[in-house]
């Protein structure tokens, strides 16, 4: 980033990755109502290339909840087993995620997306959801670094119905501990504070 933007003035700086809001770590106020098999959170336009995969979820007899605004171009292609919440206040997102048994992480396997931190995956982990994801570079790095085990889907469409069928239940998921990624802790670790002679609270 420094090289591409021409930041060569020697001003102290720090690179900060994405974190998770504290609200995602708060225990639920009541027992979750597990209405759905899978939940997807994020920018819905990015789901358009994955419509065939969403159809495989439907064909496997599974239900999916989309949390967020769904554009009409996508809504028109959704199978009947997909439900949409519409826009949800940020503080209510954890409650919506807990309505499902698995978090669905879908990211186009092209740069720069396949190198970027998936905020939704961090939030799935924070609320304790096992994760199903397409296979790409960052998700493999994160799973190895944080000792997680995610159900990574193959690129072969003919395998998807099985992956969302009996394999969905049988996979040995491990949800990694991401408490160190809560925003206050993440920000407190930035080296920039030393240059500014500030001690984070």
Mark where each language-model region is:
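Short, polar loop motifs at secondary-structure junctions
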Residues: 1-3, 67-74, 135-138
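Nucleotide-sugar-dependent
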Residues: 45-48, 91, 105-123, 133-142
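A charged, aromatic-enriched C-terminal amphipathic alpha-helix characteristic of glycosyltransferases
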Residues: 154-200
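Glycine-centered short loops/turns at secondary-structure junctions
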Residues: 61, 128-129
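Acidic, glycine-centered active-site loop in nucleotide-sugar glycosyltransferases
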Residues: 79-80, 119, 140-155
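A short alpha->beta transition loop at the rim of the catalytic pocket in nucleotide-sugar-dependent
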Residues: 101, 126-128
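Conserved catalytic-core segment of nucleotide-activated headgroup transferases in glycan assembly
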Residues: 19-26, 31-77, 83-98
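Donor nucleotide-sugar binding/catalytic pocket of nucleotide-sugar-dependent glycosyltransferases
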Residues: 1-27
């Amino acid at each position: 980033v420094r090289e591409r933007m021409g930041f060569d003035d020697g001003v102290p700086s720090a690179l900060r990755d994405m974190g998770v809001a504290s609200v995602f770590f708060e225990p639920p106020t009541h027992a979750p109502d597990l209405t759905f098999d899978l939940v997807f959170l994020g920018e819905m336009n990015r789901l358009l290339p994955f419509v065939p995969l969403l159809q495989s979820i439907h064909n496997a007899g599974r239900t999916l909840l989309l949390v967020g605004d769904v554009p009409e171009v996508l809504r028109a292609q959704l199978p009947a087993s997909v439900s949409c919440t519409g826009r949800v206040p940020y503080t209510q997102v954890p409650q919506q995620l807990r309505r499902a048994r698995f978090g669905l992480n879908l990211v186009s396997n092209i740069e720069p997306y396949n190198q970027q931190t998936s905020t939704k995956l961090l939030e799935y982990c924070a609320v304790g959801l096992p994760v199903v994801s397409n296979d790409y570079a960052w998700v493999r790095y994160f799973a190895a670094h944080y000792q997680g085990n995610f159900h990574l889907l193959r690129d072969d469409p003919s395998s998807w119905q099985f992956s969302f069928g009996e394999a969905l239940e049988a996979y040995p998921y491990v949800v990694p501990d991401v408490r160190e990624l809560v925003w206050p802790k993440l920000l407190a670790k930035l080296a920039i504070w030393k240059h500014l002679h500030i001690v984070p609270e």
